[in-house]
């Protein structure tokens, strides 16, 4: 049965490009077979899904062509082999009684270390002003945050930043903390979510450690509280935060708060807290425009040392909602796919990888639209594109148009052939393979094809 699979691989090698075959078919390993099923091993679940979606029908046809029999294909994901243990961990020896006092000293030291750690802010070092992309939608909040970081507790105290989920509020509060800490490593900075503040307060009440809790927060130089809206309706938490706020404000310490809403629009927030938030500066962050989203993608890809073509960045920016986290998730997914398959990122790859995420806000692409766009690009007539003339200035545009038709429409080979002057399906297949090969080996030619695709979606 393995011979059948080997012959099928040979068949597939003849109809697929070298890169496609080496990426998706060659890694498949024959594990065994039953009367009507062939079992193949795949490297990963991701690999299995891709091969199933794209090449399963082709694999079945290639196997059937060997002996005329149809087989089911069963995939098994290769198991990860656990690393062998190099050394057995020694068993803990019982400690002599004379070490008990020493253990007590160690416990005290641990408590002191714990206290020190509490003074170390859990800021994200990646969130800095340098890594933040400023644009019209967030410029005010960005400038206000920089002003606070450069001169804490001077003009804008408290600073209240509000905006929708995933627009950069958390990035800015971390950037403020990181900037102040870089200037003054001894600065006492506390960065908490409102939920964490509430949970810690509840535990302090439970274990009768409220004095420790209050002292911890009221000795800070900078208090950063994320998502203050989650304190709404929590009377005891708001009470404690109110007194903490007053103590820090009166000591001329900076307070920065974020929320998804303007203070007066947060239901369940006490009026006395609302009024205090309005003492300082309130800055909003709006959803970014396409240009800002493109700039964010380009900066992120540069940080990851990944080449992201302009047309791909535009495609992601236009297809994503205004949530920056969603945008970053798309980029990570695309980078992962490119890395796993060893391919360069292109617009066609992005469309394929993002097809379940991005519903393109464009009209349906038709063969006629592609013919018109290609003809305009090469300054020829559509009738010439559909003709049988074999001069190079017509053959190459014709093959490009056929390739894009196969890629962007649901038309079959015979249907495409009919639209190009009644050409047979073998001519259409030849054109597609010719363009695939040229794209793989000629960057300038690839850019031409990408440019035509881009015109179709703008």
UniProtKB/Swiss-Prot annotation:
Residues 80-119 have a biased composition (Basic and acidic residues). Residues 1-84 are annotated as: Domain I, interacts with DnaA modulators. Keywords: ATP-binding, Cytoplasm, DNA replication, DNA-binding, Lipid-binding, Nucleotide-binding. InterPro entries: AAA+_ATPase, Chromosome_initiator_DnaA, Chromosome_initiator_DnaA-like, Chromosome_initiator_DnaA_CS, DnaA_C, DnaA_dom, DnaA_N_dom, DnaA_N_sf. It holds the Pfam family Bac_DnaA_C. CDD domains: AAA, Bac_DnaA_C. Belongs to the DnaA family. This is Chromosomal replication initiator protein DnaA. It comes from Citrifermentans bemidjiense (strain ATCC BAA-1014 / DSM 16622 / JCM 12645 / Bem).
